[in-house]
Amino acid sequence: MKRSDRYSNSNEHFEHMKHEPHYNTYYQPVGKPPKKKKSKRILLKILLTILIIIALFIGIMYFLSTRDNVDELRKIENKSSFVSADNMPEYVKGAFISMEDERFYNHHGFDLKGTTRALFSTISDRDVQGGSTITQQVVKNYFYDNDRSFTRKVKELFVAHRVEKQYNKNEILSFYLNNIYFGDNQYTLEGAANHYFGTTVNKNSTTMSHITVLQSAILASKVNAPSVYNINNMSENFTQRVSTNLEKMKQQNYINETQYQQAMSQLNR
């Protein structure tokens, strides 16, 4: 074969290849959708279903929470040993706020920052402050005391928000301090102060000695485990908890340096 013939045949083959269809490895037959798009649609359906379920759950919890009448909290004021937070020394209120809910005056019933901080404290074995706000604890202690379910926690948030809308902070703090268990069948702060120390939390009282800074810190530290912490025989863990509370009270300006040092001296005797 001549060289010119070989060249001519090569050109004819090249021209033929140009007109042939080219298929790549991603070719899909007509009418069959790509697998990626199908997977994406399934994922979106799953996410949408989850969102609908969550929305329905929240809606049901909100409806159930409306059965709890926050007006009933006023009944706490009828207790014989009730003392309003307005009539307590600042360091008494500060002992509980520092330990349980240091952002009490800045939130509206739920504190995401405080809850997150409490979670990390628990993880690092520094369980000093609870994750629930004082308002949430008021709701739990009054309406859901024996309920430990997740649904209770959700309802608690809705009711706590209503409590914050209806009552001022001192009223909420009063409900808390007069409806919490201190051990030995004591459910008010005044009753606990009378029972354990022979003192009163009423700053206007002239018949009894007023509760001290240390005594306030002890009672505030006890409510976390009232049946475990023994005031008459304080464990190392309980003592450390009280010490931490006193330090927090000083940091948050509920007590000054002199009061702090005096309380620490009494604690370490």
UniProtKB/Swiss-Prot annotation:
Main location: membrane
Catalytic activity: [GlcNAc-(1->4)-Mur2Ac(oyl-L-Ala-gamma-D-Glu-L-Lys-D-Ala-D-Ala)](n)-di-trans,octa-cis-undecaprenyl diphosphate + beta-D-GlcNAc-(1->4)-Mur2Ac(oyl-L-Ala-gamma-D-Glu-L-Lys-D-Ala-D-Ala)-di-trans,octa-cis-undecaprenyl diphosphate = [GlcNAc-(1->4)-Mur2Ac(oyl-L-Ala-gamma-D-Glu-L-Lys-D-Ala-D-Ala)](n+1)-di-trans,octa-cis-undecaprenyl diphosphate + di-trans,octa-cis-undecaprenyl diphosphate + H(+)
Enzyme class (EC, first level): transferase
Keyword Thylakoid on entry: no
Membrane topology annotation: Single-pass membrane protein
Record-listed E.C. numbers: 2.4.99.28
Function: Peptidoglycan polymerase that catalyzes glycan chain elongation using lipid-linked disaccharide-pentapeptide as the substrate.
Protein name: Monofunctional glycosyltransferase
Native source organism of the sequence: Staphylococcus aureus (strain Mu50 / ATCC 700699)
